[in-house]
């Protein structure tokens, strides 16, 4: 649908608070029988601890002058959520917590998303544990989700050896990982195993050899 108008605003309110806002209005398309729609996103972020932050987000799609003969999927689709990003003061640990709830006049499109990860990365060691949950009735008409009704669990870890010789290669080492996919009843659907060997060069280029098994 053709965009009629839009506005975008973002910036720091002070040293701890940041806000972001975007709004787009589309024009009605009589040929395709689409109503005009308003798309809006608002985020409010608060700095916590030394390097971490917590954010609230609201995403809205609202049909304008919708009637029963038009082809729009619903009168509105909204998502509200919270996100917490953690970074340790020594820059070794990082993590995330994310929760989203979809709101819709259609009962089968009112679901949830919960995702999280925790990771550790030093000059030699790195590992990460990640999970994702998307319910079967979650809906995000503004944005994209790969699929519904799944749980993903992933673990990766690696180690780097540093060269002492005056050669282009800076470091090299193995990385292993395993990923599991389940439906929301926790019936296993798929799994992937991986083994990579990384080569990092002093000019910041990287070469990776890898094996994947499903």
Model segments located where?
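Exposed, low-structure sequence patches enriched in small/polar residues
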Residues: 2-4, 10, 90-214
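Low-complexity, polar/charged sequence tracts that form flexible coils or short amphipathic helices
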Residues: 34-36, 74-76, 109
């Amino acid at each position: 649908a053709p965009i009629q108008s839009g506005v975008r605003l973002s910036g720091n309110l002070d040293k701890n608070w940041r806000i972001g806002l975007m709004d787009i209005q589309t024009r009605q398309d009589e040929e395709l029988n689409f109503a005009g729609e308003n798309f809006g996103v608002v985020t409010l972020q608060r700095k916590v601890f030394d390097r971490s932050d917590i954010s609230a987000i609201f995403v809205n799609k609202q049909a304008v002058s919708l009637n029963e003969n038009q082809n729009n999927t619903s009168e509105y689709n909204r998502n509200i959520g919270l996100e917490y990003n953690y970074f340790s003061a020594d820059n070794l640990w990082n993590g995330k917590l994310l929760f989203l709830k979809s709101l819709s006049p259609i009962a089968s499109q009112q679901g949830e998303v919960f995702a999280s990860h925790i990771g550790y990365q030093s000059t030699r060691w790195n590992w990460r544990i990640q999970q994702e949950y998307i319910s079967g009735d979650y809906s995000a008409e503004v944005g994209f989700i790969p699929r519904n009704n799944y749980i993903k669990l992933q673990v990766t870890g690696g180690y780097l050896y540093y060269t002492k010789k005056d050669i282009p290669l800076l470091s090299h080492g193995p990385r292993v990982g395993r990923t599991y996919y389940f439906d929301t009843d926790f019936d296993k659907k798929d799994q992937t195993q991986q083994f990579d060997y990384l080569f990092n060069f002093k000019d910041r280029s990287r070469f990776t050899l890898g094996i994947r098994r499903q």
